[in-house]
Amino acid sequence: MSALKKCVAVAALLGLTGTAHSALFHRGGGMVYDSTLDITWLADWNLVGHQMQWATAKDWASNLVHGGYDDWRLPAVVQPDESCSHNSPQPGLLDFKYYGFTCMASEMSHLFYADLGGKTGAAITEQAGDAPQELANLALFCNMQYGVYWYGT
């Protein structure tokens, strides 16, 4: 069974396709719609099957045709982001203003913290203490890999 079919099968099997209170909805075709951000995510977080350098990932995303859409891109980051937990510089260090944990203005950070119940310093697959809706949202995605995910900006 292909990775895409496995993603869809897992979400369908569990019956976790979002509710009226959810920001995430199974869109079919290996896609998940985020109604809060008005963007569509790929359900398979490792669709390519290997890691890429940033420039290669940007080029891949901009040339991707998937689910009838050809306007894919890497997630956007917002800086400065005043929602970050560490929003003031520390003496003697580089200016880290608006960086840190629990940032919510960037697309991927919003997905991680708000929709999937991510916790600072923990893998997204660590689900202890997650609310039922966060568990349902996470079930919409598959093939999550430990490591780096690129932003487009």
What are the language-model segments listed below?
Residues 2-69, 87-88, 114, 119, ...:
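Short, compositionally biased
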Residues 58-69, 77-153:
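An exposed tryptophan-centered "aromatic clamp" motif
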